A protein has these predicted regions:
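Small-molecule kinase domains that catalyze NTP-dependent phosphoryl transfer to phosphate-bearing small molecules
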Residues: 47-49, 85, 92-98, 110-111, ...
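N-terminal phosphate/diphosphate-binding loop that engages ATP/GTP or pyrophosphate donors
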Residues: 4-69
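Active-site signature of alpha/beta-hydrolase-fold catalytic machinery across serine-
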Residues: 1
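Hydrophobic "anchor" residues on beta-strands that sit immediately upstream
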Residues: 8, 54, 100, 174-175
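ATP-dependent NMP and nucleoside kinases share a basic, alpha-helical "lid"
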Residues: 63-140
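Generic C-terminal helix-cap and adjacent flexible tail
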Residues: 193-204
């Protein structure tokens, strides 16, 4: 929504790690060295858009397959692999160099773009994020319970914040925004207000 309102492209970096995880699971890979080698050999193309983005791997749009519970259960492990992060960050920076883009991810302000014009650390409680995810998934995955998703969200938070490379943390110059009580539209409005405060008139 934010990118669309600003007329910017949108890049969900988490989708890139999910795509790598999907490919690793499809190939039955577990060893970090093998996953790194696979990642380096992938022909990955990201197509940012104003409302959504697509991840193309070896000519196939894998976007519809990367939000499954199986991928969610392994993405933190795969994204913690140094070689995988190095490859993905390089792609993300190339996209950012084009300008006019909103990057969404857990290490953007600290690792990918430490000199970004505006940094917002978006957060909400584990329960709130799990409930949102549950509502997204319940139609396609009725076997999942809210408790399962909440446990998975908490596990991912722990793993991402304790990994050695690019851990999840708020950049010192990032603005903290808790959107636990905000709608999607309200969150976008709050982020635009933050941007306007730093660069008056930029969104007009």
């Amino acid at each position: 929504i934010l990118a669309s309102r600003l007329g910017y492209a949108y890049l969900d970096t988490g989708a890139m790690y999910r795509a790598v995880t999907y490919e690793a699971l499809k190939k039955g890979l577990i060893d970090p060295a093998e996953i790194t080698a696979m990642t380096k050999a992938l022909d990955m193309e990201v197509k940012p858009g104003r409302d959504a983005m697509h991840v193309i791997v070896d000519g196939e749009d894998v976007t519809p397959f990367i939000r499954t519970p199986e991928v969610s259960g392994h993405v933190s492990e795969v994204s913690a692999i140094g070689g995988v992060r190095t490859a993905m960050v390089a792609i993300q920076r190339r996209q950012a160099e084009k300008g006019g883009i909103v990057l969404d991810g857990r290490d953007i302000g600290t690792t990918v773009l430490p000199k970004a014009d505006v940094k917002i650390f978006l957060t909400a409680s584990v329960h709130t994020r799990a409930l949102r995810r549950f509502k997204e998934l319940e139609a396609q995955h009725p076997e999942l319970s809210l408790e399962d998703i909440e446990a998975d969200v908490a596990k991912r938070d722990y793993m991402d914040s304790h990994r050695e490379i690019s851990p999840l943390k708020q950049a010192e110059d990032a603005i903290l925004l808790d959107n636990g009580d905000l709608t999607l539209e309200g969150t976008a409005e709050a982020m635009i207000a933050i941007c306007e405060k730093k660069f008056p008139g930029f969104s007009k």
